[in-house]
Amino acid sequence: MSTVFPEDSVGLVVPQTARFDEPLALACGRSLASYELVYETYGTLNASASNAVLICHALSGHHHAAGYHAATDRKPGWWDSCIGPGKPIDTNRFFVVSLNNLGGCNGSTGPSSVNPATGKPYGADFPVLTVEDWVHSQVRLGERLGIQQWAAVVGGSLGGMQALQWTISYPERVRHCVDIASAPKLSAQNIAFNEVARQAILTDPEFHGGSFQDQGVIPKRGLMLARMVGHITYLSDDSMGEKFGRELKSDKLNYDFHSVEFQVESYLRYQGEEFSGRFDANTYLLMTKALDYFDPAATHGGDLAATLAHVTADYCIMSFTTDWRFSPARSREIVDALMAARKNVCYLEIDSPYGHDAFLIPTPRYMQGFSNYMNRIAI
């Protein structure tokens, strides 16, 4: 690509690392004596530190949400369509922070990191994490950057769950919550999909109980299958039909079980292959468990409105009509609970053919609604 970046891009960005040496107590009962978080920033923090926006990523996301790491990069960050000058999260107004979560595999301390107690990768010995644990770790990052209160915490899917948890755990630190394509907890069906994905990894002979790094291998097949299952749930039936239909890769059937015959088979195998080369299997297990465990209403006997009684943020909840992983009905559960708790909330349900992945795709109505809300935030 050209060395000149698009006018609405944040341009060249450099990841940074923050190290924390104060122990972090975790929900599982264990603690991390120290940890590192990799993050990027876009825009400029104003003198009163009142214009900061935190981006929380989804299951396979990371800190590189916008811009480019090099002039030769083929693609920008994963949410570049939403972050930059004149975009919904306008870097002419906001100072944006995007991080790789604790337990991740893109530089932050996680299963592939070296355990200082053993000198070997944590592997399966890395503690199980929850959404609350992530929020607690993110608070420290904000403080390190001089941010005591976020103008907004924003996220899609698992990122939206983090944004919601922020308003519950630290109500005084968040003015606005933008929760996109999310849910107040996983359904039994969603937990089931996660379990199938985990079993694909756990039963891969190359997993070695999570110590595959010590063996110099990766559970490639398990990761491929996990990603293939997950990817099906991110797309709608209509979008898969439109994109692939029943199209064949060649003009005839092979009448065997090993050939890649349909275009959709080729797509899924490509996605699985690509994912298995860049993602850590233990991190995948951790992320899916954090999803499964998320249930903030459990502290009040399942009453989400009671859980939200003390929150002070304003909320923007968005969903997409063809998202069956986290359907609009799940977003409306959050909206209904906020209304019952007499909180300020706006809700936008967007017609989109793209399923759960719609929160990553810049369709006009989505961009307009997102921009309209963010532009209302006083800084």
Swiss-Prot record:
GO terms for biological process: homoserine metabolic process; methionine biosynthetic process. Requires MetW for activity. Keywords: Acyltransferase, Amino-acid biosynthesis, Cytoplasm, Methionine biosynthesis, Transferase. It comes from the Bacteria. It is found in: Cytoplasm. The keyword Acyltransferase applies. InterPro entries: AB_hydrolase_1 (IPR000073), AB_hydrolase_fold (IPR029058), HAT_MetX-like (IPR008220). The active site is at S157, D323, H356. GO terms for cellular component: cytoplasm. PANTHER family: HOMOSERINE O-ACETYLTRANSFERASE. Transfers a succinyl group from succinyl-CoA to L-homoserine, forming succinyl-L-homoserine. This is Homoserine O-succinyltransferase. It comes from Pseudomonas putida (strain ATCC 47054 / DSM 6125 / CFBP 8728 / NCIMB 11950 / KT2440). The lineage of its organism: Bacteria, Pseudomonadati, Pseudomonadota, Gammaproteobacteria, Pseudomonadales.
